[in-house]
């Protein structure tokens, strides 16, 4: 009887600790920058982008946001060229993914990634940046270039 009480008390304590930890887990702080896409040196569009430049920020991405403006998105950054893998877990809206080389040029496009889809999206080439924007809103093409003072591009 005494053992059951202690076991129950310990279980309740552990559950409360877990809830406390998860309740204090918060969204990483994302820096916001402004970048433009250029085609033949002419500005195509200006974007407000959240920067995901750490493991924690890249892991969180646009998850759990219920809305994104048509001129907003997220720019994922790495210091090396590698093939990248994405998914749409806990993402509330469809996205277009633009895979960019080290000079900011669009190398690949994955259109209309579906909200909440946990299937993996792979880049075919090694890339340094991935730009996520609201699906179907922009006419960005392979070869277009991201111009961003923040990145010296």
Question: Would you name each region that the model predicts?
Answer:
Residues 2-10:
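Bacterial N-terminal signal peptides that target proteins for export
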Residues 9-20:
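Bacterial N-terminal signal peptides
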Residues 26-153:
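Compact, glycine-rich, soluble single-domain proteins
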